[in-house]
Amino acid sequence: MIVGIGIDIIELNRIEKMLDGKLKFMERILTENERNVAKGLKGSRLTEFVAGRFAAKEAYSKAVGTGIGKEVSFLDIEVRNDDRGKPILITSTEHIVHLSISHSKEFAVAQVVLESSSS
């Protein structure tokens, strides 16, 4: 049973501007593992990576119903890729999490669906 749905869209140029103060912004948004992946990226690929993670974390917080804040922070949520490259969301939840991230020339968007883990 679906227990939550969240979606977020972010302008890539907004993230690009925030990356000017790169380290501080990335430390606030990305987990250590995500920052390690980001170190190998440059230019538009780095912007897309960070924007996708930002949107995914915002979408998750909306699906949970709290938004980013006291109950859920950016660092409580990690986005990884499975063996086929599919994004997966790692967090301390009892729910099954479905995540989709997409990019265009100007935007990154993410959608999260939370499913009850009990039948």
UniProtKB/Swiss-Prot annotation:
Compartments where found: Cytoplasm
Functional summary from the UniProt entry: Transfers the 4'-phosphopantetheine moiety from coenzyme A to a Ser of acyl-carrier-protein.
Principal subcellular localization: cytoplasm
GO CC terms, sorted: cytosol
Keyword match Hydrolase: no
GO molecular function (one): holo-[acyl-carrier-protein] synthase activity
Gene symbol of the encoding locus: acpS
Keywords: Cytoplasm, Fatty acid biosynthesis, Fatty acid metabolism, Lipid biosynthesis, Lipid metabolism, Magnesium, Metal-binding, Transferase
Taxonomy, superkingdom: Bacteria
Cofactor: Mg(2+)
InterPro entries: 4-PPantetheinyl_Trfase_dom, 4-PPantetheinyl_Trfase_dom_sf, ACPS, P-Pant_transferase_sf, Ppantetheine-prot_Trfase_dom
rRNA processing as UniProt keyword: no
Catalytic activity: apo-[ACP] + CoA = holo-[ACP] + adenosine 3',5'-bisphosphate + H(+)
HAMAP family xrefs: AcpS
EC number annotated for this UniProt entry: 2.7.8.7
Record-level GO BP terms: fatty acid biosynthetic process; lysine biosynthetic process via aminoadipic acid
Protein name: Holo-[acyl-carrier-protein] synthase
Family from the record: Belongs to the P-Pant transferase superfamily. AcpS family.
Residues the entry annotates as binding Mg(2+): D8, E58
